[in-house]
């Protein structure tokens, strides 16, 4: 009996000392975002500019330190050239709004990056970006139309098994803006939805009008594979305080990690567009 106990203790000691560290290293090495380089783009055109942008950037930089990836932050559209974009595994547009490119050559470089297999994470008012560029609006999944006033309401987790929903509540009650859009693209897969019945009633007429054919649930977070690339969008994150909230930080982190998991490599042989307005691939 004593020998048996010694054997079990030795086996346990072996697992803790030798096997556990190896397993931990394997987990770290296979974290897809580790050692990646991201472009965080913050440009806004004429119009409303969110005061959350610096806080969003700081939050992503802190996540980069914690999870071993790097970020380049820019509000200069000159970064959108083929040679420059090749440096990045995916792009993050955080609360961009209105026209964020200066030239159609920059728009074409962005489009070809997506076609080559690049990834895109869009945060909050990204749905109000490049409102006159049809291809971009399809890539995003919608274009902004209106939001209810800032208030506490509920967002429902529609796909809790999706990798980017890890640690996200089944029903998330938070203060934010409930975004609505138009020109919704049918390729998006909804991950979270605004629970419209949880909104304050004084704007109910405008809410019903903007919800269109949707009833009580309206898309808030979604993803899609689009034209060879990969897209993850959250309309949440209006307040600057959001970016220091642990639940929201995790929400953003899981979106970044999901996009990292989709990256293979850029292959510009698949980038066929010669104009920003070329038809979609057949």
For the regions a language model picked out, list residue spans one by one.
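Short alpha-beta junction capping motif
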Residues: 38-42, 86-130, 228
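Bacterial N-terminal signal peptides that target proteins for export
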Residues: 1-10
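Catalytic beta-strand/loop cores that center a nucleophilic Ser/Cys/Thr
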Residues: 142, 147-227
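Glycine- and acidic-residue-enriched helix-capping/strand-helix junction motifs
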Residues: 45-57
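Extracellular ligand-binding/catalytic regions of CAZymes and related secreted enzymes
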Residues: 26-36, 62, 66-69, 204-218, ...
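A short, well-structured beta->alpha microelement
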Residues: 67-80
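Bacterial N-terminal signal peptides
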Residues: 10-21
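Solvent-exposed loop/turn segments at secondary-structure junctions
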Residues: 44-47, 77-80, 96-100, 120, ...
